[in-house]
Curated annotation (Swiss-Prot):
GO molecular function: ATP binding; GTP binding
Binding site for GTP: D59, A60, R61, N62
Highest rank taxon of the organism: Bacteria
PANTHER family: RNASE ADAPTER PROTEIN RAPZ
Keyword terms of this UniProt record: ATP-binding, GTP-binding, Nucleotide-binding
Name assigned to this protein: Nucleotide-binding protein ABO_0549
NCBIfam families, A to Z: PRK05416.1 (NF003828)
A Pfam entry, by short name: PapZ_C
Family: Belongs to the RapZ-like family.
Presence of the UniProt keyword GTP-binding in the record: yes
UniProt cross-references to HAMAP family, sorted A to Z: RapZ_like
Residue intervals passing through the bilayer: none
InterPro entries registered for this protein in UniProt: P-loop_NTPase (IPR027417), RapZ-like (IPR005337), RapZ-like_N (IPR053930), RapZ_C (IPR053931)
Amino acid sequence: MKLTIISGRSGSGKTTALQALEDQGFYCVDNLPVGMLPTLAKQLSEGDPPIERVAVGIDARNLPAQLLAFDNILHALNEQQVRSEIIYLDADDHTLLTRFSATRRRHPLGTDQRSLADAIGHERELLANIRQRADLVIDSSNHDVHTLRNLMRERVARREATLSLQLESFGFKNGLPTDADLVFDVRVLPNPHWHADLRPFTGKDDCIIEFLSQHQASHDMLKDIGDFVVRWLPAFANSDRSYVTVAIGCTGGRHRSVFITEQLAKNLRAEGIVLQVRHREL
């Protein structure tokens, strides 16, 4: 059995993530008490027919003592020979505040004595151990419902028993991607932004590709990053990592980082490497 545990702070998209997996054939259970995970796994694996793919939502509504016992529960699942992975969804505090304000929903940990901001912070503390153990952390701050569903489908539901690689372009001016495992800075490359005729375009457009391809530094940077990824990707896989996100950043995240990400994806796919591409700022 493959057991996918979906956790994360309220408002980060856990329900959307579970629904996406359910649409892909997963047997889904939301808000299950942590202590019941081994029992559920045993019942479903021994069913007739046994259920092979299960997704369970775990959140801060569990008792604090159960959340503290999470490591012991994972050990019990391992003893049952259940393959488990943890997907943790999160978003920055401002985004969570905005989402709750927009929907006017009450936070699960909110009380008359605890403000929404305090509830969001308290939830982070309660789930810190689960986040630390996560195989994949998804920052949904810049995702809408549709892109989050697509991400879950491509990176989790359809993933074979191999490492899932994502290449992500971003702009440093908007902060580092919180889900990045490796970060490459390509701001040393010539910047199309300073050419007024090129500024409106992105690294996917022919004029930007032509501009950056004229500079040897672009080819050297692309080769060096590609060599690093190809060299060390097997090491990540051999260390039981299920997910790796390689983030490539420039100043605004629209020209140089997009160009390098697109070209790197093309080269890696030619090597037979399966991957997903995301451009955070586009």
